């Protein structure tokens, strides 16, 4: 059996970590990673997450730093949080890796206060959900 693993994270602040996790999953026998980079942009990406790709997954692996990331124009919830919420709704197993409070964020990636507050609340919710 091959387990399909959906990799979820913001990309600007965690690009290197995301790539390392992808390589690790891809190198395991019996595991097939799914990530946005492999299925490319779609018309629905501007409005929300790719639920079809999430439904194909057996497991969600999430990486959480301190950046909230982007969201669709009509919804303030980030794509990463939407992916997490969809996995929760589907009762999909989740492995969430949450960066420590002192994990560095480069100055050029520091988000506005409203996004930082959303990310902080999202991080707390994920840690409580374990």
Annotate each PLM feature.
Residues 41-42, 46, 67-89:
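Conserved TIR/SEFIR loop-to-helix hotspot centered on a Trp-containing motif
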Residues 89-102:
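A short helix->loop->beta-strand "cap" motif at the edges of active sites that frequently abuts
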Residues 50, 77-78, 109-113:
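Short low-complexity, flexible loop/linker segments enriched in glycine and/or proline
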Residues 21, 50, 80-83, 118, ...:
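A general structural detector for well-ordered alpha-helical segments in enzyme core domains, enriched
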Residues 100-130:
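C-terminal interaction surface of TIR/SEFIR-family domains
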Residues 16, 70-71, 103-108:
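Switch/connector loops and helix/strand junctions flanking conserved nucleotide-binding motifs
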Residues 62-66, 98-101:
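Short loop/turn segments at strand-loop or loop-helix junctions that form parts
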Residues 1-63, 88-90:
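Conserved N-terminal substructure of TIR/SEFIR domains
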